Swiss-Prot record:
Belongs to the diacylglycerol/lipid kinase family. GO terms for biological process: phospholipid biosynthetic process. GO terms for molecular function: ATP binding; ATP-dependent diacylglycerol kinase activity; metal ion binding. May catalyze the ATP-dependent phosphorylation of lipids other than diacylglycerol (DAG). In fact, is not able to exhibit diacylglycerol kinase activity in vitro. Keywords: ATP-binding, Kinase, Lipid biosynthesis, Lipid metabolism, Magnesium, Metal-binding, Nucleotide-binding, Phospholipid biosynthesis, Phospholipid metabolism, Transferase. This is Putative lipid kinase SP_1045. SMART domains: DAGKc (SM00046). SUPFAM superfamilies: NAD kinase/diacylglycerol kinase-like. Binds 1 Mg(2+) ion per subunit. This ion appears to have a structural role and is required for catalytic activity. It comes from Streptococcus pneumoniae serotype 4 (strain ATCC BAA-334 / TIGR4). The keyword tRNA-binding does not apply. Its cofactor is Mg(2+). Residues 1-131 form the DAGKc domain.
């Protein structure tokens, strides 16, 4: 008997997630003979539900929530020998993972388009004990770029990136950082560190195809507004690695430390202070989505 567990964060979708409960259950019942729904009430509920689904060998877990809820679910299924397939309905603010997978950002559309015959294996990152499906970062520039609205990008193009960058530079500072990997190290000043599990950033392809179990590490060495603005044209051209202000390393095992107390971020949510050890778990989770064309 095919079984699926639906996990819903009730605060998702502008706190209207439960309005979609019946529709999501009916969608799952088109494919699975048994569907059980769990509603989160507090932090880590999604992890515990996902652990149960893995332990009971459910065929799939379908989660309705933002990146934080999705990463809780990934944490729950990854800690087990059996990993159910994963469905994601975007219900958060950033929804970085579903955007990466090109899942419809409209809730009704995402449910309608959920195809349980179509899957895509993705890499997962683990930073200490925190999981992420897209990006680990230190510094405010990633948030500035993520927060550019699609409508603004369409209307104003590069100007929108520039305005958000100038806003972020006001609070930035350079810190001493040490990045250690199996493919090289970086020791020196930096204003931002990004660890990407994909070849895309801010909707732009900046690396070659990246389904190889490696993370792309970008270190912005200068906090000045001129350095940040110089990155934008290269980002839009998909050639950010060539920028003189960027240090680039590709690796699977990463340790980041600093002599300052620096906070990190995973998929838009606050994470541990440094030091952090990151491992890339290659092709770890099978997600219901169409394969992304490179």
């Amino acid at each position: 008997m095919k079984k699926a567990m639906v996990i819903i964060n009730p605060t998702s979708g502008g706190e209207k997630a439960l309005d979609y409960k019946e529709k999501l259950e009916n969608k799952a019942k088109e494919y699975f003979e048994y569907v059980e729904t769990k509603i989160t009430e507090k932090a880590l509920d999604a992890t515990h539900f996902a652990e149960e689904a893995s332990r009971e060998q459910y065929d799939a877990v379908v989660v309705f929530g933002g990146d934080g809820t999705v990463n809780e679910v990934i944490s729950g299924i990854d800690e087990r020998d059996y990993i159910p397939k994963l469905g994601i309905i975007p219900g958060g603010t950033g929804n970085l993972i579903t955007k990466l997978l090109e899942i419809n950002q409209d809730i009704d559309g995402a449910i309608d388009e959920l195809d349980f015959d179509l899957t895509n294996k993705i890499d997962i990152g683990k930073a200490n004990d925190n999981y992420f499906g897209y990006i680990f970062s230190i510094g405010s520039l990633p948030e500035a770029i993520h927060n550019v609205e699609i409508e603004d990008k369409t209307k104003f193009g590069i100007l929108t990136y520039a305005v958000n960058t100038m806003k972020s530079v006001m609070t930035d500072q350079v810190f001493n950082i040490k990045v250690e990997t199996e493919n090289g190290n970086y020791v020196g000043e930096a204003s931002h560190v990004l660890v990407l599990l994909t070849n895309y950033f801010a909707d732009k392809k900046i690396f070659e195809e990246n389904k190889d179990g490696y993370a792309n590490i970008l270190i912005l060495k200068d906090a000045s507004i001129f350095s940040k603005l110089s990155v934008i044209p290269d980002l839009l051209k998909g050639d950010v690695v060539a920028n003189d202000n960027i240090e680039y390393i590709k690796a699977r095992n990463i340790k980041i430390s600093s002599d300052s107390e620096l906070e990190s971020d995973v998929d838009g949510d606050k994470s541990d202070n440094l030091p952090v050890e990151i491992k890339v778990l290659a092709q770890r989770v099978e997600v219901f989505s169409k394969p992304k064309e490179d």
